[in-house]
Amino acid sequence: MNFTSEILKCCYKREEVLKNGLSMTIYNKYFDKMRKSAHILVSEGRQDELLPYLGSESVSIRRDIAGLLYNSYPELCKSIFREISEMTVETGLQKCYTIVVATAIDILKYGIPKDFP
């Protein structure tokens, strides 16, 4: 199974949920799938396959990938979260992505569990 591909599918599905205002239950379902695939990828030492996606134009995908890679590349991911945390609707952020900003702020404040993903 191509875990990188599975992770990206989940990221795109999560973004779709936000854009279309769908249920957070669906959003969280894809989070669980994404996390499980990332756990396997990281345990195989292949987390670097996700690094290019930290540069995605999608704020949602950058946030998801930074969350998955946080414990492997903490300083890099913190810089992504800092960048996202400063985004506002007034500076061009689409309103549907405000939850992404909120989670970035929370991660900067509280961190991510050491055993994640």
Language-model segments: what does each one mean?
Residues 2-12, 21-42, 63-74, 94-114:
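Structural detector for internal amphipathic alpha-helices that build alpha-solenoid repeat scaffolds
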Residues 2-8, 17, 42-53, 74-86, ...:
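Amphipathic alpha-helical scaffolding segments comprising HEAT/armadillo-like alpha-solenoid repeats
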